[in-house]
């Protein structure tokens, strides 16, 4: 199952960008949708924007693996466990380093949905409240007014800024 996401949020320093190339087009489907994370943030109710301005969540690749997101050979999984920290915190409202714009930064596959905390005080949000807020935020990128569709042709290359968009 696919979902709106930005790549490698489980890394301490997530990737700047991603690049994909179409070497063979399927007979139908296969489009990639992009959603503007800044517009998604701006579209939130003021109360939620204020609430998430100091909230961070723990992103962990193990959450994705435990949900059956991808099958990884045991040797690679062991190597990842040895090299990659057990969860990293990222703010839900993340400031783009070049534009200065705030963007909604959330990945439902890697985020521990019960892990939200105030990064100014260290105070954890309650488990149920955290899960409810995450569920609400995950809906935001699904709104068509923030999206564009890229229809692939053989040989096309797409390059995107993971700090500014999500893709599906």
Name each region found by the language model:
Residues 1-157, 163-168:
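Non-heme Fe(II) oxygenase catalytic core, chiefly the N-lobe of the double-stranded beta-helix
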């Amino acid at each position: 199952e696919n979902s709106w996401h930005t790549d490698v949020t489980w890394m301490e320093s997530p990737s700047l960008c991603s690049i994909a190339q179409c070497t063979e087009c399927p007979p139908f489907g296969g489009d990639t949708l992009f959603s503007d994370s800044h517009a998604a943030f701006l579209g939130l109710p003021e109360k939620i924007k204020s609430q998430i301005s100091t909230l961070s969540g723990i992103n962990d690749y193990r959450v994705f693996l435990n949900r059956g997101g991808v099958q990884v050979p045991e040797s690679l999984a062991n190597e990842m466990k040895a090299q990659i920290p057990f969860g990293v915190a990222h703010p839900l409202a993340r400031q783009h380093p070049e534009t200065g714009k705030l963007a909604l930064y959330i990945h439902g596959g890697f985020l521990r949905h019960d892990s939200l905390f105030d990064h100014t005080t260290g105070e954890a949000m309650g488990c149920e409240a955290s899960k409810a807020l995450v569920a609400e935020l995950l809906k935001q990128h699904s709104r068509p007014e923030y999206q564009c569709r890229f229809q692939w042709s053989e040989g096309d290359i797409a390059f995107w800024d993971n700090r500014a968009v999500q893709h599906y």
